Amino acid sequence: KEGYPMGRNGCKISCVINNNFCKVECQAKWRQSDGYCYFWGLSCYCTNLPDDAQVWDSSTNKCGG
């Protein structure tokens, strides 16, 4: 599984071309994952996630920002 990790506010985690920051964010939530900064979305994107990982979904978006 893969997807955008969410911050405490339910929003995607913003980044500006900083893959290491995103890798740390992803691994803080899911140890075996990897992550990078998705340039077009300016948001962190995680890969190699467990099937039950909760990631941002446009259909259930509760982001207030």
UniProtKB/Swiss-Prot annotation:
CDD domains: neurotoxins_LC_scorpion
Name under which the protein is recorded: Putative beta-neurotoxin RjAa1
Entry superkingdom: Eukaryota
Keyword Magnesium: no
Tissue expression pattern: Expressed by the venom gland.
GO-annotated molecular function: sodium channel inhibitor activity; toxin activity
Subcellular location: Secreted
Family, per entry: Belongs to the long (4 C-C) scorpion toxin superfamily. Sodium channel inhibitor family. Beta subfamily.
LCN-type CS-alpha/beta domain ranges (all copies): 1-64
Role noted for this protein: Beta toxins bind voltage-independently at site-4 of sodium channels (Nav) and shift the voltage of activation toward more negative potentials thereby affecting sodium channel activation and promoting spontaneous and repetitive firing.
Organism of provenance: Rhopalurus junceus
Single GO cellular component term: extracellular region
Cystine pairings recorded for this chain: 11-63, 15-37, 22-44, 26-46
UniProt keyword annotations, A-Z: Disulfide bond, Ion channel impairing toxin, Neurotoxin, Secreted, Toxin, Voltage-gated sodium channel impairing toxin
UniProt keyword Transmembrane helix present: no
Annotated SMART domains: Knot1
Any single GO BP term: defense response
Domain notes: Has the structural arrangement of an alpha-helix connected to antiparallel beta-sheets by disulfide bonds (CS-alpha/beta).
